[in-house]
């Protein structure tokens, strides 16, 4: 049985009452129904995030953003997952401070250390009662998610990467790290995003089963793949992977 590491998690705004699971009328890119929080990375940096989905639930997903973006790029997908019963945490990496609904994390930008931000996000969800977890990352967020998964072992049930590079500004995953990722792995990239497509091949060859490579006909990168010409296929692949390896507990009504 897992023993979650408890860290303080500070609510900033009262959660908006949820209607019909997560509010079917809520725009997918909206923060309505979400809760703004702060939490700490595993090396003590205070980060800004948002919780989407139901107040309770054992299945959780951490969404990690790419470099030229922030947590708001995930809001539409976070809402969709929340409506399916997942507890979803988006967050800004250290030093990323877009402001407004997108939040503002403390610290300086330090890309080689951001895997510790992902670890902190995992602890934040665990402190809320989540016991089955997936890490989903775009570009550098995917690289950081693989590193975190290699360290957290069986605490992570699935990892999904969108256009993740093997290395970026001092953040990197080599064969020795990839070999430690026991979670079910889904690697997605576009064939016109050449470096990302090559990375999928490398990741697939250096990791254990279960794993799946998906190369699509597109030049979109990271979270842009969820709004581009292959958006439907990308989201379907991701949701199917989550449903298979991080299923939401279904309530069974009695006779």
Predicted regions and their residues:
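Alpha/beta-hydrolase active-site loop
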Residues: 73, 106-128
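The serine-hydrolase catalytic nucleophile loop
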Residues: 67-79, 199
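N-terminal cap/lid segment of alpha/beta-hydrolase-fold proteins
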Residues: 25-53
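Primarily recognizes the serine-hydrolase "nucleophile elbow" in alpha/beta-hydrolase
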Residues: 123-182
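Short beta-strand element of the alpha/beta-hydrolase
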Residues: 58-66
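Conserved alpha/beta-hydrolase
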Residues: 81-102
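Short beta-strand/loop motif that positions the catalytic acidic residue
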Residues: 181, 187-189
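Catalytic histidine neighborhood in serine/cysteine hydrolases
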Residues: 207-223
């Amino acid at each position: 049985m897992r023993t979650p590491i408890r860290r303080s998690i500070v609510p900033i705004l009262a959660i908006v009452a949820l209607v019909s699971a997560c509010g079917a009328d809520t725009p997918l890119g909206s923060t309505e129904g979400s809760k703004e929080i702060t939490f700490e990375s595993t090396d003590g940096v205070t980060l800004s995030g948002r919780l989407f989905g139901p107040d309770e639930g054992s299945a959780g997903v951490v969404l990690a953003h790419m470099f030229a973006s922030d947590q708001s790029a995930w809001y539409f997908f976070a809402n969709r997952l929340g409506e399916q019963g997942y507890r979803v945490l988006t967050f800004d990496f250290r030093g990323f401070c877009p402001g407004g609904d997108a939040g503002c994390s403390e610290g300086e930008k330090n890309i080689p250390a951001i895997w510790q931000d992902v670890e902190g996000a995992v602890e934040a969800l665990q402190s809320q009662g989540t016991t089955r977890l997936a890490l989903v990352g775009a570009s550098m967020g995917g690289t950081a998610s693989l590193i975190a998964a290699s360290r957290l072992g069986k605490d992570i049930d699935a990892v999904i990467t969108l256009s993740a590079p093997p290395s970026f500004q001092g953040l990197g995953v080599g064969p020795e790290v990839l070999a430690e990722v026991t979670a079910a792995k889904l690697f997605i990239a576009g064939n016109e995003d050449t470096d990302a497509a090559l990375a999928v091949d490398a990741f697939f060859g250096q990791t254990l089963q279960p794993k799946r490579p998906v190369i699509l006909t597109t030049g979109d990168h990271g979270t842009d793949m969820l709004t581009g010409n292959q958006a439907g296929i990308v989201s379907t692949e991701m949701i199917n992977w989550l449903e298979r390896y991080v299923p939401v507990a279904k309530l069974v009504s009695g006779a």
